[in-house]
Amino acid sequence: MDITLSYCILLTLIVSTLGLNPCPGDTRGDRRCNHDPTHRVCAKIGIEGTSFWEFTGQTSWCGTSGDYGGPYGSLPRCPPAQPTWCICKWATARWIAGEGCGDEIQFDCEATDVCDLKASYQDFNVDLQPAHQCLEKKCKRQWDSCPDKAVKTVNIGRFIRL
């Protein structure tokens, strides 16, 4: 594969990550779901009756303050008016595996790092296949615009060796 194509694919990945919209209910940093390797999915978990907490084994922190610092750090996390949060890829997969991919599962596709999820197979030893299948359906435009998983892996490795 020529170097120009490798650079184009790398540039696409960078632009897709930097071009993420903020996840409105998240109060960490700039509110974008790209601040660490796992919190890449902007999902509505602050809505009443969500099954997210049940299927991920977590306790709801929505409506509480995390005191993260910065301009948003002391605001309530995933409040009812903005019930989204940058959730872990593993939590996304477990939630979908338990709930299915119906109307109960809602994502902000413009604020989700879909390409990162597409290129990931496991997160904290959790198989991400349920998340792949659901995001491919619910965030189809973003999913289809990502490089093929195999191509991304080969090109990133090749780019790093240069």
Map each language-model feature to its residues.
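Cleavable N-terminal signal peptides of Sec/SRP-targeted secreted and luminal proteins
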Residues: 3-19
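Extended boundary segments
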Residues: 16-52
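Short alpha-helix capping/helix-loop boundary micro-motifs
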Residues: 63-77
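Short, Lys/Arg- and Gly-enriched loop/turn segments at beta-strand edges
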Residues: 92-108
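Glycine- and charge-enriched low-complexity intrinsically disordered segments
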Residues: 112-162
